[in-house]
């Protein structure tokens, strides 16, 4: 028996040492390995190259079998740099796919694609591992009931509600609040649903991954004093990694999330940033394996690869994985095969607006651009649906009137339009909300607003009952009662000033 070399530290399953081969060819991150007749590894088996380079430095490279070439050769993709490898080096077939640590011990830790901790906090204290390749849950295991996943964030719950076990696309440029929104969702799922989160950094900037980790520590999402009380596990395969690592890191994160769903029976949030990089890495690997490219140079297996990842993200009778995926749209072309294939799997889109961020309205979720398949009367109920539609109509009318206001001013509008504008401005401000994770920056205590409270608040604004209140009373508050109290305080303050 020997330790599984695909992961490190405690809690690694042991595998019988299987077959040995030799490197026959190296093409960048791709290796051809020759095995003795009848000793060929299976597709997706993990191979390990151990030895020393010409300078005497130790080498330990893990690869994944992608093709069986014939003549007792296989083609494998490396999960780390192939620097220093030479022909003839010994390769060990572990006899199983890549396996990664799973369970509560992963919370608060950072892992690479192989499930190795990279945060210098020592080995992971778990004996449970799981292979990253597995079938999607069977139809009989799926929970087909449509239910809303309440986030406690007003703009999301009212206008673009998330489906429990659904997939949400998160669109937004740099600096509009993606990270803070992600951290608030991680915080709220832990408090309201007793759930945990897994963050998969797929092919994005290492600096951003580091910033996210530091901000999570600062806001308490990761508890440095008691790491077991952390609410999130982080898995990174960043831009500088070989394409094999970037292609598989999403599966590593998903495998950790599946354990929380299937064994711990929890509601899990899975973040993937960025799903486009998963496709991009697959395209690079496909070219290295010599496959004929398809439309726009993408891999011919694009839909299959995307489907095998997305179909595992679902609700079962045990628990749910709700996935929020940042989507990069190359050259803003929504018809590009990568985003187009992603859209087919999404249940909702949350679009962050730079214009709203510039106004200081956070979360800067665009209420008119964000959509959800869940916003139907038979799913959310007539009251929720009617309120959401009226809010959108009011905001749309305000948007149409903005050019007239900019040129002629408010006084030139009809009485009805002036009332619409006043209510729309109150709605716009009431869609903002103080976040728990931003408390350390803003000094304002965070607020979790239940769906029923959210609907009641917007109904009161639309009914005209609050027309006499100043619009600043609705800015950065939780429920409508707080807005009313703030309006009273503002009135008292203005009287005292007089």
From Swiss-Prot:
<comment type="similarity">
    <text>Belongs to the ATPase alpha/beta chains family.</text>
</comment>
<keyword id="KW-0375">Hydrogen ion transport</keyword>
<dbReference type="InterPro" id="IPR004100">
    <property type="entry name" value="ATPase_F1/V1/A1_a/bsu_N"/>
</dbReference>
<dbReference type="Pfam" id="PF02874">
    <property type="entry name" value="ATP-synt_ab_N"/>
</dbReference>
<dbReference type="Pfam" id="PF00006">
    <property type="entry name" value="ATP-synt_ab"/>
</dbReference>
<keyword id="KW-0472">Membrane</keyword>
<dbReference type="GO" id="GO:0045259">
    <property type="term" value="C:proton-transporting ATP synthase complex"/>
</dbReference>
<keyword id="KW-0793">Thylakoid</keyword>
<keyword id="KW-0066">ATP synthesis</keyword>
<dbReference type="InterPro" id="IPR024034">
    <property type="entry name" value="ATPase_F1/V1_b/a_C"/>
</dbReference>
<comment type="subunit">
    <text>F-type ATPases have 2 components, CF(1) - the catalytic core - and CF(0) - the membrane proton channel. CF(1) has five subunits: alpha(3), beta(3), gamma(1), delta(1), epsilon(1). CF(0) has four main subunits: a(1), b(1), b'(1) and c(9-12).</text>
</comment>
<dbReference type="InterPro" id="IPR020003">
    <property type="entry name" value="ATPase_a/bsu_AS"/>
</dbReference>
<protein>
    <recommendedName>
        <fullName>ATP synthase subunit beta, chloroplastic</fullName>
        <ecNumber>7.1.2.2</ecNumber>
    </recommendedName>
</protein>
<keyword id="KW-0139">CF(1)</keyword>
<keyword id="KW-0934">Plastid</keyword>
<comment type="function">
    <text>Produces ATP from ADP in the presence of a proton gradient across the membrane. The catalytic sites are hosted primarily by the beta subunits.</text>
</comment>
<dbReference type="GO" id="GO:0016887">
    <property type="term" value="F:ATP hydrolysis activity"/>
</dbReference>
<dbReference type="Pfam" id="PF22919">
    <property type="entry name" value="ATP-synt_VA_C"/>
</dbReference>
<keyword id="KW-0406">Ion transport</keyword>
<feature type="binding site">
    <location>
        <begin position="172"/>
        <end position="179"/>
    </location>
    <ligand>
        <name>ATP</name>
    </ligand>
</feature>
<dbReference type="InterPro" id="IPR027417">
    <property type="entry name" value="P-loop_NTPase"/>
</dbReference>
<keyword id="KW-0150">Chloroplast</keyword>
<dbReference type="InterPro" id="IPR036121">
    <property type="entry name" value="ATPase_F1/V1/A1_a/bsu_N_sf"/>
</dbReference>
<dbReference type="InterPro" id="IPR000194">
    <property type="entry name" value="ATPase_F1/V1/A1_a/bsu_nucl-bd"/>
</dbReference>
<dbReference type="InterPro" id="IPR055190">
    <property type="entry name" value="ATP-synt_VA_C"/>
</dbReference>
<dbReference type="InterPro" id="IPR050053">
    <property type="entry name" value="ATPase_alpha/beta_chains"/>
</dbReference>
<keyword id="KW-0067">ATP-binding</keyword>
<dbReference type="InterPro" id="IPR003593">
    <property type="entry name" value="AAA+_ATPase"/>
</dbReference>
<dbReference type="InterPro" id="IPR005722">
    <property type="entry name" value="ATP_synth_F1_bsu"/>
</dbReference>
<dbReference type="GO" id="GO:0009535">
    <property type="term" value="C:chloroplast thylakoid membrane"/>
</dbReference>
<keyword id="KW-0813">Transport</keyword>
<dbReference type="GO" id="GO:0005739">
    <property type="term" value="C:mitochondrion"/>
</dbReference>
<dbReference type="GO" id="GO:0042776">
    <property type="term" value="P:proton motive force-driven mitochondrial ATP synthesis"/>
</dbReference>
<keyword id="KW-1278">Translocase</keyword>
<dbReference type="GO" id="GO:0046933">
    <property type="term" value="F:proton-transporting ATP synthase activity, rotational mechanism"/>
</dbReference>
<keyword id="KW-0547">Nucleotide-binding</keyword>
<dbReference type="GO" id="GO:0005524">
    <property type="term" value="F:ATP binding"/>
</dbReference>
């Amino acid at each position: 028996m020997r330790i599984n070399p695909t992961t490190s530290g405690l809690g690694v399953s042991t595998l019988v040492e299987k077959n040995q081969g030799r490197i026959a060819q190296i093409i960048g991150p791709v290796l051809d390995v020759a095995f003795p007749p009848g000793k060929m590894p299976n597709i997706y088996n993990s191979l390990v190259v151990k030895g020393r380079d010409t300078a005497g430095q130790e080498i330990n490279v893990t690869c994944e079998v992608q093709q069986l070439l014939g003549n007792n050769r296989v083609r494998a993709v490396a999960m780390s740099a192939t620097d220093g490898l030479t022909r003839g080096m010994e390769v060990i077939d572990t006899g199983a796919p890549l396996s990664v640590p799973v369970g509560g011990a992963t919370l608060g830790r950072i892992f690479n694609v192989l499930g190795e901790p990279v945060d210098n906090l020592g080995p992971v204290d778990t004996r449970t591992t799981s292979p990253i390749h597995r079938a999607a849950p069977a139809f009989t295991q799926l929970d087909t009931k449509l239910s809303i996943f309440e986030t406690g964030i007003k703009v999301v719950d009212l206008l673009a509600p998330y489906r429990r076990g659904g997939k949400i696309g998160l669109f937004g440029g740099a600096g509009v609040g993606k990270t803070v929104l992600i951290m608030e969702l991680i915080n709220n799922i832990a408090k309201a649903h007793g759930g945990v989160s897994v963050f998969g950094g797929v092919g994005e900037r290492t600096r951003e991954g580091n910033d996210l980790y530091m901000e999570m520590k600062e806001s308490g999402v990761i508890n440095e004093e008691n790491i077991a009380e952390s609410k999130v596990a982080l898995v990174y395969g960043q831009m500088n990694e070989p394409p094999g690592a970037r292609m598989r890191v999403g599966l590593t994160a998903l495998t950790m999330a599946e354990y929380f769903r299937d064994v711990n029976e929890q509601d899990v949030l899975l973040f993937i940033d960025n799903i486009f990089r998963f496709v991009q890495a697959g395209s690079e690997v496909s070219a290295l394996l010599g496959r004929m490219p398809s439309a726009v140079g993408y891999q011919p297996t694009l839909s299959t690869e995307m489907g095998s990842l997305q179909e595992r993200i679902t609700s079962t009778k045990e628990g749910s994985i709700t996935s929020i995926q940042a989507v990069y749209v190359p050259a803003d072309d929504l018809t590009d095969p990568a985003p187009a294939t992603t859209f087919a799997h999404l249940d909702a889109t949350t679009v962050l607006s730079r214009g709203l961020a510039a106004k200081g309205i956070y979360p800067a979720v665009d209420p008119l651009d964000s959509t959800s398949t869940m916003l139907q009367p038979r799913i959310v109920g007539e009251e929720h649906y009617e309120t959401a539609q009226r809010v959108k109509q009011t905001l749309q009318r305000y948007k149409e009137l903005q050019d007239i206001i900019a040129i002629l001013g408010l006084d030139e509008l009809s009485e009805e339009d002036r009332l619409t504008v006043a209510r729309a401005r109150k709605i716009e401000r009431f869609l903002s909300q103080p976040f728990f994770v931003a408390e350390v920056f803003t000094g304002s205590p965070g607020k979790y607003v239940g769906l029923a409270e959210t609907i009641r608040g917007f109904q009161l604004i639309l009914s005209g009952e609050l027309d006499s209140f100043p619009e600043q009373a609705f800015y950065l508050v939780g429920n409508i009662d707080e807005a009313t109290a703030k309006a009273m305080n503002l009135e008292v303050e203005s009287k005292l000033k007089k």
